[in-house]
Amino acid sequence: LPPRYFHPKSLNFPAEPGRCLPNLYEFKRNYLTSLKSENGARGTVGMPLALGMYELLPLWHAVFTRLGFNVKVSPMSTRRIYEKGQFSIPSDTACYPAKIMHGHIETLITDGVDAIFYPCLTYNMDEKMTDNHYNCPVVAYYSELLNGNVEELKRVKFLYPYLNINSKKELAKELYTYLGKFYNGITKSEVKAAVEYGLTRYAEYMNAVREEGARALKFARVKNKRI
């Protein structure tokens, strides 16, 4: 069957038969959904696949897996997920990606996770290509709003530390200090190793995305397609 693409009005149109264009969105979705986690002795940590978690999932998934947690990722966004969390959205002025985060949180709680992780990040990863790398304030601090508006979060540990992901040393220190408040027995050395592992997995993910992007550009040039 030909691949399918979504119209902005949510209508589903099949692609023209025989046209197999590179699809980086599909590539990234497949990459993220392929991340697996084994049953961990320290419990299950849920990660909502929305806002800033979408691009940083390979990092956090690897960190918590290495620390001995089972990582449960919420499904790809759907209308049903949005509807599940719509009653805890405090403002209509928030962007849709922020609004749907409520549904992802509710879904993870329903799935029975022990904790949910969505950190506050003033800065995104510095890719050395722009003047600054500030996060949008909504992305950076939406955990605070979730904590104040999603009543069901009282049923789980909601982990939302303020972290610096651009310093390996600082990230390990901050995570160790924060997680130690909730989990006994976590050592500095294992957090340091987990951060190292997570940053390596994140770099692999970014390299894979860049390689796929280069492949798509090459395809467009060879086939004389618009770029």
Model-derived features: where do they sit?
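An N-terminal assembly and electron-transfer interface module characteristic of large anaerobic redox
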Residues: 1-227
